[in-house]
Amino acid sequence: MNGQKKKILLVEDDMALSAVYRSRLEIEGFDVREANNGEDALSATVEYRPDLILLDAMMPKISGFDVLDILRNTPETANVRIIMLTALSQPKDKERAESLGVDDYLVKSQVVIGDVVARVKHHLGIQ
């Protein structure tokens, strides 16, 4: 990557899974910050100003769907790229995320970490 590292906010309440994703993203050259619930995700987005957010859907305090809705309706965060990475595999869940403005929707059981990294790079315009 050229110049400054791209910033990723990883929002995941499963600490073990979060550690795996963080490690791989850092190996790939990203600056990664973690949030463990929706409330922390909102404050971290304002403070950290990430280039992309990997967002779980099912979390304590505020769901990923609500975080997505709030971010898309806040002028300062409306254009941040957001990939929802979730266990929810029903079409209605993906449709809900798309209606709220998600950039990509990945089901955890259907992807490996390399797929996630590839989608992150794609959305950040990295080869």
Put a short name on every predicted segment.
Residues S43, F65-A78:
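Short amphipathic alpha-helix used as the core "switch/output" element in two-component signaling
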